[in-house]
Regions:
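Interdomain motor-coupling "hinge/lid" segment immediately C-terminal to the ATP-binding subdomain
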Residues: 1-99, 103-104
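Accessory nucleic acid-recognition modules appended to NTPase machines
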Residues: 61-178
Length: 178
């Protein structure tokens, strides 16, 4: 069974986690300063930091949130993608290394030659692995400005789908700007 569960917006996270009822605003309303944060006891920046580290998925209130998210990522990288792509065990290990390497360095301007060399992935296979991770919802790709079929080949930057993944997989505290 395939089911796509989108992550929570910051507003949705606040409404669920704090029991609030914040309305949605247009970008113009936000940029013009017509939005007032109505809850004086909580500051948006503190709440936003909590959201970045562990508020994207609806199960954020689980006491074992990080372990559950790690398990989901592991399931996708070690089982779901390899089964879909008919990968062998060696390829699965390389896919896992790629995901871990990307989590350490996002946003990432891909240097395909370095990744291929460091991870032992062939030139023809690396774009497929990145596409699989994107299709699984783990990565977002920013395409390079190109024309024709070149647009399918070039990736300007690679981002993790959401910051919670970086907090779970990275060895250090992720840069908030990512």
């Amino acid at each position: 069974v395939e089911y796509h569960l989108p992550g929570l917006s910051f507003r949705e996270y606040l409404n669920i986690s704090k029991g609030w009822n914040l309305p949605s605003y247009t970008l113009d309303e936000i940029l013009s300063g017509k939005v007032d944060f109505p809850y004086k006891e909580e500051r948006p920046v503190k709440c936003f930091k909590e959201y970045l580290s562990g508020g994207y998925y609806p199960f954020f209130s689980d006491t074992e949130y990080s372990l559950r998210l790690q398990g989901i990522i592991k399931q996708m990288v070690e089982s779901d993608i390899p089964m879909f792509a008919e990968m062998n065990i060696a390829s699965t290990v390389k896919l896992k290394k790629l995901m871990y390497a990307l989590a350490q360095s996002v946003p990432f301007k891909p240097n395909y030659a370095k990744l291929e060399r460091d991870l032992g992935i062939s030139r023809n296979t690396l774009p497929d692995y990145i596409a699989y991770l994107e299709k699984a919802g783990l990565l977002n790709l920013l395409p390079e400005k190109a024309q024709g079929l070149k647009v399918l080949e070039k990736v300007e930057k690679i981002y993790l789908n959401n910051p919670n993944v970086a907090y779970v997989l990275a060895d250090t505290t992720p840069d908030v700007g990512t």
